[in-house]
């Protein structure tokens, strides 16, 4: 056989002629001799001492690194080489038994070539065809086996370097077994006989302390090599076979830093480990259930591009389901109704019966395209939790970046009295009943797309203190988000959602009685709800509860025009059974297209947005000032410099905008209970539009320069009622200027104006 086929440790004791120096030649072992012929015709063999493999770059040792302890060394002359050949010792790489005997430390002549059928004694050794050496007593077979044992090679020298890390070190552990050692400190050979160091098992103890950075070199002799390329069948207990590593307990045979085995670190399982096919046709129910049963406190990992068809599964313990991305061409799909098997797929596809948390990541559970029943009692829910009847809190499921869609029941049911669940970045579409149904407390639902319920709600919540934020709820048969609190106090937060094109209400909240409301509905956007019958249902419908917080919502339609033919709510906000809001309505509402009927169905609420500010009947307007002369309210026109109206606790002043208001009405302390004019008081005086009343008396201008009065009823014409007589100066003639009803008197006569500019007089007698 070729000695190159022996282990590298064997090859170090052989000499192989690798020809002359030439650029590009590759040196792979220490025992290769490369010859160089000088100018005098002397040929010398050189051996490479540097790193292996080495590619020669030059035509002589001097041009390829030179002669040194880390490059080339002169090893043999051509004369010695020829002498070895004359003694039948070739350097071609063929086996030479005396050389192998020396390498293994065997007695000369004790080594022979293995040949089946020969008989071995205790003093004989055998070289097998793979370069290994064996000993034993018995007949040689076709390959080594009991009772023969392998002899291991003792390599001559191993070099081990150590750099001192800290000042004062005296002990260095050698990670090899050895029988002799030479020690150099910074290139100086140390003498153990003089006490410079001593050997304690595999540790070298120096008599003098070492300094940081000292380079310690150890040359170890007769180091046993443990790599064995062939093992007897009787020795298998000492080794790990490929079959040991590939069986189900193989990971137990591989260590793991800082302790334990690889098996301890493996927290993932896959359906394929339990026989799942994932072709969308094969029934993978048993494989998936077995995988779930095994995965307590582990993660069950589902592959992309595979569809695992299954009947109903039970999850009895905490674990994690992990896919490789929502809607990434891989899913768990229901077995579905199969008429030929008389099988109707009902119940819950993945039912969580554990009281602990089950988590889902990046997983698709998809029933779209699968035949299911939409008859009550035969429906199939996608993922659901068993109801909690224990009377104590139990954790709900957690789901992140998942898609559960297409089921004839609910896509997801959180379980009765299951609490603290989380749904985030998920999609729930196309269910028969409500897409998501929650009957526990303290759930957090955020950034989810939820819609297209064929018969019910997008999100149905039946318990208190839940939070839905930044979700889309769209195209559902009934309301987008439905909350009903059957008993007790009601608490819910609905913030930042988009509620779009639902058949009935956008958001519907129903409390059990007229209690203080714990409802927060803010920063939501409503589009085109009441699609079942436009103008019939409402964007926000609130039943019972005092002080609902409804703020900063946006109410829109697809077509932003008056009389839009896209669906619109009846009222933006509808209050039933005494429900009230906590403060002003400040939602963005446009009267042209946000609603069909009005912004709100009651006039008791206060309203303030871009269109108007309205104080409802349920609230009085109070403005407090510091004194009776402080102005509380001002009214003015943008283009004018002065107020038109000023109101303070004592008066109301009016002006025309060109100067400070100076006249109006007032209450003076000197005249308590009397309203007085400021700089005069007057009316236009027209009988039909501005009659002045004092009690039941009416006073107006007759239009003929007369002032008229009537008692108990409004005048029917300008000349209705009686003329009020007014005393004037005594006329000088019977045709002096005068108005009907005017009169005058002197010591002799009483004068009466009976017609315009017509006077009559009568003599006055002494009293």
Curated annotation (Swiss-Prot):
Keyword tags: Degradation of host capsule during virus entry, Degradation of host cell envelope components during virus entry, Host-virus interaction, Lyase, Viral attachment to host adhesion receptor, Viral attachment to host cell, Viral tail protein, Virion, Virus entry into host cell
Main subcellular location: virion
Matching entries from InterPro entries are given as: Pectin_lyas_fold, Pectin_lyase_fold/virulence
A GO MF label:
lyase activity
Might you name a Gene Ontology BP term for this protein? symbiont entry into host cell via disruption of host cell envelope
> Per the record, GO CC terms?
virus tail
Per UniProt, subcellular location reads as: Virion
| Homology family | In the C-terminal section; belongs to the K30/K69-specific depolymerase family.
According to its UniProt entry, the function of this protein is described as: Functions as a receptor binding protein (RBP) and probably mediates the attachment to the host capsular exopolysaccharides. Displays a depolymerase activity that specifically degrades the K30/K69-type polysaccharides of Klebsiella pneumoniae capsule.
* Protein name in the entry: Depolymerase, capsule K30/K69-specific
User: From what organism does this protein derive?
Assistant: Klebsiella phage K64-1 (Bacteriophage K64-1)
- What does UniProt list as this organism's lineage? Viruses, Duplodnaviria, Heunggongvirae, Uroviricota, Caudoviricetes
Gene that this polypeptide is encoded by: S2-6
């Amino acid at each position: 056989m070729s000695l190159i086929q022996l282990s590298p440790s064997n090859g170090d004791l052989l000499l192989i002629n690798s020809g002359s120096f030439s650029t590009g030649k590759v040196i792979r072992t220490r025992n290769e001799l490369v010859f160089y012929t000088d100018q005098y015709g002397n040929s010398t063999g050189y051996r490479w001492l540097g790193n292996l493999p080495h590619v020669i770059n030059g035509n002589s040792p001097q041009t390829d690194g030179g002669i040194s302890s880390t490059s080339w060394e002169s090893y043999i002359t051509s004369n010695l080489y020829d002498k070895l050949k004359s003694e039948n010792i070739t350097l071609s790489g063929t086996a030479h038994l005396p050389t192998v005997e020396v390498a293994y430390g065997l007695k000369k002549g004790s080594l022979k070539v293995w040949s089946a059928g020969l008989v071995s004694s205790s003093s004989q050794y055998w070289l097998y065809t793979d370069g290994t050496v064996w000993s034993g007593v018995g007949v040689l077979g076709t390959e080594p086996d009991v009772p023969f044992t392998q002899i291991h090679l003792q390599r001559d020298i191993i070099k081990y370097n150590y750099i001192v890390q800290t000042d004062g070190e005296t002990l260095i552990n050698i990670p090899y077994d050895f029988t002799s050692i030479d020690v150099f400190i910074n290139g100086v050979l140390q003498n153990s006989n003089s006490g410079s160091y001593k050997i304690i098992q595999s540790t070298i103890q120096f008599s003098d302390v070492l300094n940081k950075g000292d380079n310690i070199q150890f040359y170890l002799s007769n180091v046993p090599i443990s790599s064995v390329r062939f093992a007897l069948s009787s020795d298998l207990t000492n080794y790990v076979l490929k079959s040991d590593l590939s069986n189900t307990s193989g990971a137990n045979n591989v260590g793991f830093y800082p302790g334990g085995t690889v098996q301890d670190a493996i927290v993932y399982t896959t359906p394929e480990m339990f026989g799942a096919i994932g072709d969308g046709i094969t029934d993978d129910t048993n494989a998936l259930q077995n995988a779930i049963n095994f995965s307590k406190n582990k993660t069950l990992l589902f592959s992309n591009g595979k569809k695992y068809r299954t009947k109903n599964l039970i999850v009895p313990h905490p674990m994690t389901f992990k896919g490789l991305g929502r809607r990434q061409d891989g899913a768990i799909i229901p077995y579905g109704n199969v008429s030929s098997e008389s099988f109707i797929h009902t119940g819950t596809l993945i039912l969580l019966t554990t009281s602990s948390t089950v988590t889902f990541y990046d997983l698709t559970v998809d029933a779209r395209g699968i035949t299911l029943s939409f008859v009550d009692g035969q429906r199939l829910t996608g993922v659901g939790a068993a109801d909690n009847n224990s009377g104590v809190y139990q954790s709900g499921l957690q789901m992140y970046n998942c898609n559960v869609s297409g089921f004839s029941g609910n896509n997801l049911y959180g379980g009765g009295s299951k609490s603290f669940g989380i749904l985030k970045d998920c999609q729930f579409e196309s269910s028969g009943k409500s897409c998501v149904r929650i009957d526990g407390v303290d759930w957090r639902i955020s950034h989810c797309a939820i819609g297209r319920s064929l018969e019910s709600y997008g999100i149905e919540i039946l318990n208190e203190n839940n939070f839905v934020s930044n979700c889309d709820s769209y195209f559902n048969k009934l309301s987008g988000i439905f909350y009903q609190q059957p008993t007790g106090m009601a608490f819910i937060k609905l913030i930042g959602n988009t509620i779009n094109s639902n058949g009935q209400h956008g958001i519907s909240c129903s409390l059990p009685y007229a209690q203080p409301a714990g409802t927060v509905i803010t920063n939501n956007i409503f589009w085109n709800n009441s699609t079942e019958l436009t103008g019939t249902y409402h964007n926000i419908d609130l039943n019972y509860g005092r002080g609902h917080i409804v703020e900063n919502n946006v109410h829109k339609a697809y077509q932003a025009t008056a009389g839009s033919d896209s669906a619109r709510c009846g009222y933006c906000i509808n209050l039933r059974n005494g429900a009230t809001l906590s403060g002003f309505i400040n939602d963005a509402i446009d009267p042209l297209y946000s609603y069909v009927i009005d912004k709100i169905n009651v006039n008791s609420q206060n309203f303030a947005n871009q269109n108007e500010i309205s104080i409802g009947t349920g609230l009085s307007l109070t403005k407090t000032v510091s004194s009776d002369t402080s102005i509380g309210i001002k009214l003015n026109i943008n283009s004018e410099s002065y107020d038109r109206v000023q109101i303070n606790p004592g008066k109301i002043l009016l002006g025309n905008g060109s100067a400070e208001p100076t006249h109006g009405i007032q209450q003076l302390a000197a005249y308590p209970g009397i309203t007085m004019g400021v700089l005069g008081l007057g009316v236009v005086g027209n009988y039909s539009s501005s009659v002045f009343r004092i009690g039941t008396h009416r006073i107006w201008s007759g239009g003929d320069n007369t002032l008229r009065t009537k008692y108990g009823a409004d005048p029917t014409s300008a000349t209705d009622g009686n003329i009020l007589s007014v005393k004037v100066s005594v006329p000088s003639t019977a045709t002096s200027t005068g108005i009907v009803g005017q009169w005058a008197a002197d010591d002799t006569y009483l004068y009466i104006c009976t017609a315009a500019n017509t006077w009559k007089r009568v003599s006055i007698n002494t009293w």
